[in-house]
Amino acid sequence: MASPGEEVTSDESGEESNAMNLMEFSDEILLHILRYTPVSDLVLNVRRVCRKLSVLSLDKSLTHAVTLHKDYQVDKDKVKQLMREIGKEIQELNMSGCYWLPGSTIDQVTRCRNLVKLNLSGCNLTSLRLSKMLSALQHLRSLAIDVNPGFDASHLSSECKATLSRVLELKQTLYTPSYGVVPCCTSLEKLLLYFEILDRSREGLIISGQLMVGESNVPHYQNLRVFYARLAPGPVNQEVVRLYLAVLSDRTPEKLHAFLISAPGGFPQSCAVKNLLDSMARNVTLDALQLPGSWMNGSSLLQRLKFSNPVYFSFSRCSLSGSQLVQRVLNGGKDLRSLVSLNLSGCVHCLSPDSTLRKAEDEIDSSIAETLVASCCHLRHLNLSCAHHHSSEDLGRHLCQLLAHLKCLLSLALPVCSIADVSPVPADKPSVQPATNATSPSFGKKVRIGVQTYPRNCLEQGNSRPQPSVFWTLLESLPFLQQLELIGSSFSSAMPRNEPAIRNSLPPCGRAQHVGDAEVAAIGQLAFLQSLTLAQLPNILTGSGLVHIGAQCQHLRTLSLANLGMMGKVMYMPALVDMLKHCRCLRDLRLEQPYFNANAQFFQALSHCSSLQRLCIISRSGSLQPDAVMAFMTACLEVIMCHMFTGESLTVCKTLQQSLIKSFQASRPALNVVIFPLLHEDLTEVIRDVPMMHLDEITLFKSRVAEEPPNLWG
């Protein structure tokens, strides 16, 4: 702007006249923009900007569905104000994972009398509080809750039971042996059950899976269309789920089209379950199936079940041979365009014709992979992890080359050994591997401390494409991939579920030694990548590929790195530090690496990740610098979860944990801090107090691609 007395040039005046105020946009455009703003911000902040935004912020198209899930800055006062302002307008409310809100705040949901869909998973909820709430929500049709110790269905009022009788969709997470509210939901069409019951109470008492079964406690499954059960490890969870299934086996619902049970380890099949599966084979047609491996191994069930336009299959950890996959699942190679998601994790024989004679180091039958790709051409989610899938040297028959035809893939999980390019390199062509990777993996290359060992101009080099490997070609063919997992076939996390930390790990597959920094750099092609997992890549020497990913994958939100390079040294630390400086959108970071030194340099680089919300470090014999952690938490205002399990002493861990809580709890209501020695005998007791949302999504390692059907719970 010109000051008084100055002439305004024509260029300046024209620039001002062409400038457009945001408020000059049409209401339709502004509403579209406001859809990307959390409703809590719209109601509590944006509407106060001006009169126009005050009206638009309360538009029913914006306020009918409210999500507080992962809105970590919302506190009890904001929730109360939000419910007072727009409670009557809300039809869908998602408060899942709001573990920090007190029960009195959850009571405010009663103001939303027009609610149709309510998600309170992970919230503080008693049977009395639930009864009072549901009594006021007569229009409710979809409900998600937790059932905690002390839950008593006899506390539910008749008005509450009347509401439950109209509920069509129920998601129930069980922390105690109970039917919960299932017997009251007489019109259920979709039932999702998550069994998280521990075998022992806090006092050390053994928990029994027996339930008081009476006439009024029997679930009603006659209208059921979708049944899903996910079990945490432990015999009690198996015992309780059998009671749910026993009722289902008496009369199989005619409309059942999705039957899914996810159970780790061995899960013996009972007589009731066998009767249920036999009944399903006779009476229902499915479009989604997942069963424990022990129920399918050696069974003719797949041959007898009927499918119609299937959208999801999970045969995780089944001894399914390639011949069975082609004949029984892929219907002899016929069109399966309807299939959206396929989980073959842990199916070690699924790409080989015969499972009886195959050894881990044997090569796959590429014709089976070719049939899979041709039949399921619209696959969006594919998991082939936890197995050895070794390709032959035949030209054009590598697994990566075949998977490149799945142009619709959004998420992909592969074992590290499956992407190894073992074809001989002609003498006139340069090797794909960097020169540093030529070092024998058995001997560590000496590294000068404080000196970068990866090329300083690696980002410039990234613009000049190297001789393409089969993995490079695969990713080049999947430009819209959003989630990628490369997991060593013998990798196991040092922190398993409900057990002491694992002190030793299995050696990586020999073929994984062919996968190094160049293959990791290829991931930088994925411009839309949001989630990346790299686990057990022994030939990562400098980590130069990580820098390329950080610079190129600007949408990366979740990063999990585990056991990269040699176990005795963290040689990729300089590259990791440079990578983190580029990760502006990163929200979740999980690092699992023995001897990892979480020092000031690391945390200073991590401070560049301004969007970071959750951090988990797991390091056997690792160390940390408390002052650096405090400085990092001060700089990164969005961080609400800090989990560190290292080799530090209990005294150091407790002192740091208390300091973090004291300094930041008041300003960050959702703050969850756990600093604890990894190999301490009380680790499992500490873990049980971690909110399930954090434990399941980041602290515990697992493959997440095709873990559940897409949109299982909207």
Question: Where are each of the predicted segments found?
Answer:
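C-terminal capping region of solenoid repeat domains
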Residues: 1-16, 29, 77, 154-171, ...
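Short helix-loop-helix/strand-helix junction enriched in hydrophobic and basic residues
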Residues: 27, 42-60
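Alpha-helical bundle protein-protein interaction modules that mediate dimerization/oligomerization
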Residues: 117, 121-126, 133-136, 140-147
